[in-house]
Design a protein with these regions (language model features):
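C-terminal helical subdomain
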Residues: 107, 123-160
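Residue(s) in the substrate-gating loop at a strand-loop-helix junction
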Residues: 67
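Active-site loop-to-helix junction immediately N-terminal to the catalytic Tyr of the SDR YXXXK motif
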Residues: 73-81, 93, 121
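Alpha-helical segment proximal to the catalytic Tyr-Lys
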Residues: 52, 96-97
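Conserved mid-core segment of classical short-chain dehydrogenase/reductases
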Residues: 19-33, 76
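Conserved amphipathic alpha-helix within the SDR
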Residues: 1-8
């Protein structure tokens, strides 16, 4: 309400909050609820806040940051991956429900990026993308009409492979990560 009052319009809203606990920290239901509270329900609450304003003004754009592991699954990310899959399903449902109102929904698919939430993953930092490059690439695509937005052509191809071969890609990513860190 304060944002709408101050700026008169809300043209875009981006949900980029993320909680990705370490494997051993996400074995109970409470951990799963906490992850869903941030990753899924945070996006739902954002949508519930901005949607009435966007409908009144005749349009707007809502973006949710998703993850390839929400498509493929990933060993050890049993709280995070399903929360991102649910987030993608929410974006699809909202896109269908708001199609006639001029409000569009989009999902951002960044690659594995060097952030605090990915620091514990058993992946060498060299294999993680630079957050500045990813952020700039995604920002350039925020005006695109595509539902799935990636920061680069390579990431778009990799994301398409995840959609085409989800379980196969999940196995591959899990195996590659295990090879990078045999102790994991």
């Amino acid at each position: 309400e304060a944002t709408a009052a101050q700026f008169a319009r809300i043209d875009a809203a981006i949900h980029n909050a993320c909680l990705c606990p370490k494997v051993q920290e996400a074995r109970d239901s409470a951990s799963h609820r906490e992850v869903f509270d941030v990753n899924y329900f945070g996006a739902l609450h954002l949508t519930q806040c901005v949607l009435p304003h966007m409908r009144r003004q005749g349009g707007g754009r809502v973006f949710f940051t998703c993850s390839g592991v929400g498509i493929t699954g990933f060993a050890g990310l049993t709280a995070y991956a399903p929360s991102k899959a649910a987030l993608e399903a929410l974006a699809k449902c909202c896109a269908l429900e708001c199609a006639g109102a001029g409000v569009t929904f989009h999902i951002l698919h960044p690659p594995l990026t060097r952030t605090r939430s990915s620091a514990f993953l058993p992946v060498p930092p060299a294999f993680m993308a630079d957050p500045e490059i990813v952020g700039r690439g995604l920002a350039k695509r925020l005006t695109s009409r595509r539902f799935v937005l990636c920061h680069s052509l390579l990431q778009r191809v990799q994301t398409q492979a995840c959609y085409l071969f989800p379980l196969r890609m999940g196995r591959l990513l899990t195996r590659m990560t295990a090879r990078c860190n045999p102790r994991a």
